[in-house]
Curated annotation (Swiss-Prot):
The protein, known as: FACT complex subunit SPT16
Annotated compartments: Nucleus; Chromosome
UniProtKB keywords: Chromosome, Coiled coil, DNA damage, DNA repair, DNA replication, Nucleus, Transcription, Transcription regulation
Residue ranges of coiled coil: 432-500
Compositionally biased residues, Polar residues: 499-519
Job description of the protein: Component of the FACT complex, a general chromatin factor that acts to reorganize nucleosomes. The FACT complex is involved in multiple processes that require DNA as a template such as mRNA elongation, DNA replication and DNA repair. During transcription elongation the FACT complex acts as a histone chaperone that both destabilizes and restores nucleosomal structure.
Biased composition (Acidic residues): 929-985
Organism the protein comes from: Xenopus laevis (African clawed frog)
Pfam families xref list: FACT-Spt16_Nlob (PF14826), Peptidase_M24 (PF00557), PH_SPT16 (PF24824), Rttp106-like_middle (PF08512), SPT16 (PF08644), SPT16_C (PF21091)
Gene Ontology molecular-function annotations: nucleosome binding
Keyword DNA repair: yes
Recorded family membership: Belongs to the peptidase M24 family. SPT16 subfamily.
């Protein structure tokens, strides 16, 4: 996909940047211009220059010089980067339109000698900015390379005074916007998951099996874990990287800094410190924990004291407080409660983080005078080093360290919010193993416990794993609660902003037959008071009260002709207010107050009178035939025009005459260009694809019109697909299409059932071998094509591959198919019509018919654009419910569930009609099981999730019976609906039919006792509602 720049974010941030420069009272405010140079150096991971670029543009631009002057900004970069920066460049006559200085773009030449002219332009701009003497730079950022050297040489020749503005810029960008906070929360969530689901479990396995594992090897395995999708919750692995190599220490050798590297010593089963930081889309997070194996009482007390200090520090980190003051509060507490630990505690208690992992100017120590601001994110970590273990016997047991840290968010009031929600109490990080003497005592007390033996470690492991699973569920629920609040707030704000735009009702097109009398035909039929059809102006002229009156063909609803005796009758019905209109006819007339003709009937004789050249009724017969023809032609044209409505005109395809263009042959296209499918070739050009069929038909798809480019491999499928979901529909085959795909068949779609087969038939084995080779060949060809296209487009277009492991079965249309998530969508491209849902457009997901006794449930997708029809996915297996919830939670999508099917058309109409009233009543909270609204009755009846006894009042019982009856009727009616096409096991037959079949089967089997019992049950049951799942659970 095209690399786009978030212009709104750029304008907001550049205003803040210039605002800090002009209003500041430090060295930053006294500089005359700011120079930021970024070269190419793979060894530099974090730098102020690259951080500023990422903050402004969302990307790192190497070999780029930025000069910020008082009245203008100059960017010098390669031609490709200049094209990218043009998105924010001010056009002529539109300077300062966004309150930001005008931008001048300079193209860097490959030959350094050719860049001198551009260098001179930037030097001249610096000299005329304010006093032109002092320039702000990042002193520590020095990049190698010829281009950077040439620039530094020219800059150093001038007599500019250089001022380091690193701290001031860091303080400016330290306050995170909402979008940045979401990225940091996601990074913290991934860090927490990798620690909880991988590292902690791995350490417990090592302890349980008494393995010998080196710190370095364990750190490498943690780094590899971020490539495994099961630890990332559906996040694209390409957007994730380590902030630093994981640091694992134990056995008396501890250095509580983030610049150290895990050593090659074996892990010792004592105090095991782990520091882990993960970066998501350039934003960092950090987590530090200490796992303790059989900790002594003193070790536990010191650890609890460390947690107490951290809690106290979080309370001090609030808007407006000085960093040094927060530090001093902690030091005073240590001095007061445990003065012996003053020399053991770490010198700094944390630092600010964001695009850079460690912000050196915002460290929590006793010298930092900066004030905290709401929206800042800190890594708060406290450690106690070189602690003595009095009970230690071996050298590695005598010294230990404790280290705890989290990523936290500074709030306006109250304590800072922890973003890395990994439990850290002693019971959560302690691994307690039973001693041999304790096991012997238990054997004497109870012989049954002898079966455990020395496997107590496994029992401890199981307990910890169970606790972790519970923690994951609690974490998911907590996250969903946060999303619910955020959902209502954002939806309310969005609808308020849209309130100003009034929707214009589309009026029915007014068709005027003749603009003046001169256009009316002078045919003899008009003088003879006969019906006349003017094909040119698509008008029927008919006599009304002796006057020839024109009616446009669009006003005629339908016509009918009948012969009764000696007469022929022609009846013409017209469209008029109050009449039933077709779905596509529109129901608003230009002038509804006017007088309308509803119908006209003409009669003509079938008897030929002497002297007449023809039968009088011939005029009506001809009129009937010609009106039908004109009406058909008019409706066809109108349908084509309607298809073209809203079609955005695309740019012309720029053909690349180079014969080495990426090309795939022997592909089919869906939807078909003609009635019969035809093969063709797909070729990538300068700005788009062109598909050419063997007949010569052409379909062009531009890169900038592609919303999702999907590649569906042939693994487990009979076809291999390239699918394009478009931003704006395109026209071909006289219809508009937003989904176009190109595919080829891999194996035989059909199987000859009459063929005699044998297990070791050579032909079959050979055919299977050929199919395997064909699959491999096709997959390789498609992957090569994709790589070439991405290279050709400079990665402006990127193909997404569905995650088959996260897929689930469902029926979005009439048949069941495999729905698979990608990094930005939920898709099925192998069946037609295809199914593509963009996750960014989803407001929330609601699960319907989630009941204990049903095997399937339905999924409703509600979009942020409330006027858009909701998407239903039916008949999803109940086993897929938890994985879907986990995936949605990882994508920050709110989900709810209920036992009944809701009328979504009515719900969405209610919301659109009165959005303010909807959100005043709680918004989407009515979908929650414990929410108020339509689901409250469900929560009191069949959807009771816990096993507590419920004693309703009389009114509630009546309501419950009513709701059960409604649901029972709904279940019976669902047999004929499309939504339950694949769930015949639950709602295929009603209770009476099932009981009748059971009675017949029992009679045939001569089970008289069972027959009597079932007949008794039938008398007692009648038309009872479906059984309560909670009662079934209690049996």
């Amino acid at each position: 996909m095209a690399v786009t720049l978030d212009k709104e974010a750029y304008y907001r941030r550049i205003k803040r940047f210039f605002g800090s420069w002009k209003k500041g009272d430090d060295e930053f405010a006294n500089v005359d211009a700011i120079v930021v140079s970024v070269g190419v150096d793979e060894e530099i991971v974090y730098a102020k220059s690259t951080a500023l670029q990422t903050w402004l543009f969302g990307y790192e631009l190497t070999d780029t010089i930025m000069v910020f002057c008082e009245e203008k900004i100059l960017f010098m970069a390669s031609k490709k980067k200049v094209e990218f920066l043009k998105q924010i460049a001010n056009t002529k006559g539109n300077e300062n339109a966004n309150g930001t200085p005008a931008i001048t773009l300079l193209v860097r030449e490959k030959q350094n000698e050719s860049n001198k002219g551009n260098f001179d332009k930037m030097i001249e701009a610096i000299k005329v900015s304010k006093k032109g003497k002092r320039i702000g730079v990042f002193i520590k950022d020095k990049f190698p390379g010829d281009f950077m050297k040439s620039w530094y040489d020219i800059l150093n020749k001038e007599s500019f005074e250089k001022v380091d503005i690193s701290a001031s810029v860091a303080y400016t960008i330290a306050v995170k916007e909402e979008g940045e906070l979401n990225l940091m929360k996601k990074a913290a969530s991934i860090t927490s998951d990798v620690f909880s689901k991988f590292f902690k479990d791995r350490v417990m396995e090592i302890v349980d099996a008494d393995e010998k594992v080196r710190h370095g090897k364990l750190a490498e395995s943690v780094e590899k874990a971020i490539e495994d999708k099961k630890y990332l919750g559906g996040t694209d692995p390409s957007t994730i990287e380590m902030c630093y190599p994981p640091i694992i220490q134990s056995g008396g050798n501890y250095n509580l800094k983030f610049s150290v590297v895990s050593d090659k010593n074996h892990m010792h089963f004592g105090a095991i410190t782990c520091a882990l930081g993960i970066r998501y889309k350039s934003y960092c997070s950090n987590l530090v924990r200490t796992l303790m194996v059989d900790p002594t009482q003193e070790m536990q007390e010191n650890y609890n004291f460390l947690l107490q200090l951290q809690e106290e520090l979080l309370k001090e980190l609030k808007h407006g407080a000085k960093i040094c003051d927060a530090y001093q509060v902690i030091m005073d507490q240590v001095k007061k409660q445990k003065p012996d630990l003053m020399s053991k505690i770490t010198k700094t208690l944390g630092f600010a983080m964001g695009i850079e992992f460690r912000e050196g100017s915002l460290v929590i120590n006793n010298k930092n005078q900066y004030k905290l601001k709401k929206g800042m994110v800190f890594s708060v970590h406290l450690g106690l080093a070189e602690l003595n273990n009095k009970m230690g016997k071996k050298p590695e047991e005598k010294t230990y360290a404790l280290f705890v840290g989290d990523t936290v968010l500074v709030n306006e009031e109250g304590a800072a919010t922890v973003l890395t929600n990994v439990k850290k109490k002693v019971k959560n990080v302690g691994i307690f193993l039973k001693k041999e003497d304790e096991e012997e005592e238990e054997e004497e007390k109870d012989e049954a416990e002898d079966l455990l033996g020395r496997g107590s470690r496994a029992a401890a492991l199981l307990t910890e794993r169970t606790r972790n699973e519970m923690t994951a569920e609690e974490k998911r629920r907590t996250h969903q609660k946060e999303l619910a609040t955020q959902l209502n707030d954002e939806a309310k704000r969005r609808l308020t902003e849209q309130k100003g735009g009034q929707q214009t009702m589309k009026a029915r097109k007014s068709n005027v037959s003749y603009k003046n009398a001169s256009q009316v035909p002078k045919e003899p039929e008009l003088r003879e008071m006969k019906l006349y059809i003017d094909k040119k102006y698509e008008t029927v002229i008919m006599p009304v009260f002796g006057i020839s009156t024109p009616f446009h063909i669009a006003t005629i609803k339908n016509i009918s002709m009948s012969v009764e005796g000696d007469y022929t009758y022609l009846r013409i019905n017209f469209f008029c207010p109050g009449s039933a209109l077709g779905r596509n006819e529109g129901n608003i007339f230009p002038n509804p107050e006017a007088t309308f003709v509803k119908e006209i009937t003409y009669r003509a004789s079938n008897v030929k009178t002497p002297g007449d050249p023809s039968v009088p009724s011939l005029n009506l017969q001809n009129a009937f035939r010609i009106i039908k023809e004109v009406q058909k032609r008019y409706k066809t044209r109108e349908a084509e025009e309607k298809e073209k409505e809203g079609i955005v005109k695309q740019d012309s395809l720029v053909i690349n005459l180079n014969r080495s263009n990426p090309k795939l042959k022997d592909l089919y296209i869906r939807p078909n260009i003609a009635q019969k499918r035809m093969q063709g070739s797909l070729e990538a050009h300068v700005n788009g694809f062109r598909f050419t069929s063997v007949r010569g038909d052409k379909v062009d798809i531009l890169y900038n019109n592609i919303k999702h480019a999907l590649f569906q491999p042939c693994d487990g499928e009979m076809i291999i697909v390239l699918h394009f979901h478009l931003k704006n529909a395109i026209m071909f085959g006289k219809k508009r299409h937003t989904d176009v795909q190109f595919y080829t068949e891999v194996g035989e779609i059909t199987t000859d059932l009459g063929k005699h087969q044998h297990m070791h038939d050579r032909d079959d084995l050979y055919a299977e071998q050929l199919e395997r080779e064909m699959r491999h060949k096709l997959k390789t060809a498609f992957k090569n094509f994709i790589e070439k296209v991405e290279s050709l487009t400079k990665e402006d277009l990127e193909f997404e591959i569905p995650f088959r492991d996260l897929g689930f079965n469902g029926a979005p249309y009439r048949s069941t198919c495999l729905l698979q998530p990608t990094s930005s969508s939920l898709v099925n491209t192998t069946e037609w019509p295809p199914f593509v849902v963009t996750l960014d457009e989803v407001e929330l997901v609601h699960f319907e018919r989630v009941q204990f006794h049903l095997k399937n449930f339905d999924m409703v997708i509600v979009y942020k654009e409330y006027g858009k029809k909701v998407t239903m996915i039916n008949a999803i297996p109940m086993a897929s419910l938890d994985p879907i919830k986990e995936w949605l939670n990882s994508c920050d999508i709110k989900y709810t569930e209920g036992v009944q099917s809701l009328n979504w058309t009515k719900i969405m109409k209610t919301i659109v009609d009165d959005p303010e009233g909807f959100f005043e009543q709680g918004g989407w909270s009515f979908l929650e099981p414990d929410g108020e609204g339509s689901d409250a009755a469900e929560g009191d009846s069949e959807s009771e999730l816990d096993d507590e006894t419920f004693n309703p009042s009389e009114d509630e019982e009546e309501e419950e019976e009513d709701s059960d009856e409604d649901y029972s009727d709904e279940t019976e009616d669902s047999v004929d609906s499309e939504e339950s096409a694949d769930s015949e096991e639950e709602s295929g037959k009603d209770w009476d039919e099932l009981e009748e079949e059971a009675r017949k089967a029992d009679r045939e089997s001569l089970y008289e006792e069972v027959e009597e019992q079932k007949s008794g049950n039938r008398k007692r049951k009648g038309h009872a509602p479906l059984p309560n799942p909670s009662k079934k659970r209690k049996k």
